[in-house]
């Protein structure tokens, strides 16, 4: 049976090959956080923020992966489906590893959001979501390898698929509708 390399593991391998010890989850959280806060999708701003987390300017192969990650996030946030897929270890990994990565993702999201939000006013719902993410970032040690732990993790994951979308819709201008061609 061939070994399946998850996107998370592939990205971790790429980052490690460049000497970066950062988690793919934290990097993805950073990108999604800054995007949800209204930073837009230009590559240079993303590279600048990623470089701080990576502690160095990314090499070309990592830059290309960062561009791909940003294009994926842009498609998720602005597409018709508005579905967010978190870059986390697969369900076959131990719960402790998945919970730790989820905590890292939340930390990255909060950092990215904080970098990009500027002086925008946060509504009650946005504050609640950010407080929830801060609490989830601390949950990594609370989940144990049990059926209850798995259930708790899955409930948190369901929330995590929606939370970024709530913030994105609050802090980003909706795309202008495309004019429909008229027949004359």
Swiss-Prot record:
PANTHER family: UPF0149 PROTEIN YGFB. SUPFAM superfamilies: YgfB-like. It comes from the Bacteria. InterPro entries: YgfB-like, YgfB-like_sf. GO terms for cellular component: cytosol. Belongs to the UPF0149 family. This is UPF0149 protein PSPPH_0305. It comes from Pseudomonas savastanoi pv. phaseolicola (strain 1448A / Race 6).
């Amino acid at each position: 049976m061939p070994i399946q390399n998850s996107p998370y593991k592939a990205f971790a391998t790429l980052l490690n090959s460049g000497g970066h010890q950062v988690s793919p989850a934290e990097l993805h959280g950073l990108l999604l956080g800054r995007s949800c806060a209204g930073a837009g999708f230009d590559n240079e701003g993303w590279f600048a923020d990623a470089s701080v987390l990576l502690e160095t300017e990314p090499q070309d192969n990592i830059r290309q992966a960062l561009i791909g990650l940003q294009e994926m996030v842009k498609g998720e946030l602005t597409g018709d489906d508005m579905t967010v897929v978190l870059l986390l270890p697969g369900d076959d990994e131990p719960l402790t590893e998945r919970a730790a990565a989820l905590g890292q993702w939340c930390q990255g999201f909060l950092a990215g959001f904080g970098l990009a939000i500027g002086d925008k006013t946060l509504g009650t719902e946005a504050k609640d979501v950010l407080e929830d993410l801060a609490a989830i970032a601390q949950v990594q040690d609370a989940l144990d390898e049990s059926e209850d732990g798995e259930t708790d993790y899955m409930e948190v994951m369901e929330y995590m698929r929606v939370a970024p979308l709530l913030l994105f819709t609050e802090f980003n201008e909706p795309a202008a509708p495309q004019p429909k061609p008229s027949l004359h």
